[in-house]
Structures are given as C-alpha cells and as structure tokens.
From Swiss-Prot:
Biological function: Major toxin belonging to the bicyclic octapeptides amatoxins that acts by binding non-competitively to RNA polymerase II and greatly slowing the elongation of transcripts from target promoters.
Cross-link 2'-cysteinyl-6'-hydroxytryptophan sulfoxide (Trp-Cys), where in sequence: W12-C16
Similarity field: Belongs to the MSDIN fungal toxin family.
Cross-link Cyclopeptide (Ile-Pro): residue positions: I11-P18
Top-level taxonomic group: Eukaryota
InterPro entries in the cross-refs: Amanitin/phalloidin
Key words of the record: Hydroxylation, Thioether bond, Toxin
UniProt organism field: Amanita fuligineoides
Name the record gives this protein: Alpha-amanitin proprotein
Modified residues ((3R,4S)-4-hydroxyisoleucine): I11
Membrane-spanning ranges: none
Length: 33
C-alpha cells in the first residue's frame, strides 16, 4: 500500500492530507480492481 499511496498522493495533490489520500487510494483501488 505504501508504494500505491506514494504514487497516488502526488498525482491527486493530497500530500497534505494523508488520511484523505488513503481513503481516495482505497476507492480508486476498488474501482480499478
């Protein structure tokens, strides 16, 4: 998950909100998978 978050966060510009970034990453992962 660390690698995914590190890749997702900068793209969405949610580096200042790790908690939100984690939720967004989970939603994206579920949507793609």
């Amino acid at each position: 998950m660390s690698d995914i978050n590190a890749t997702r966060l900068p793209i969405w510009g949610i580096g200042c909100n790790p908690c939100v970034g984690d939720e967004v990453t989970a939603l994206l992962t579920r949507g793609e998978a």
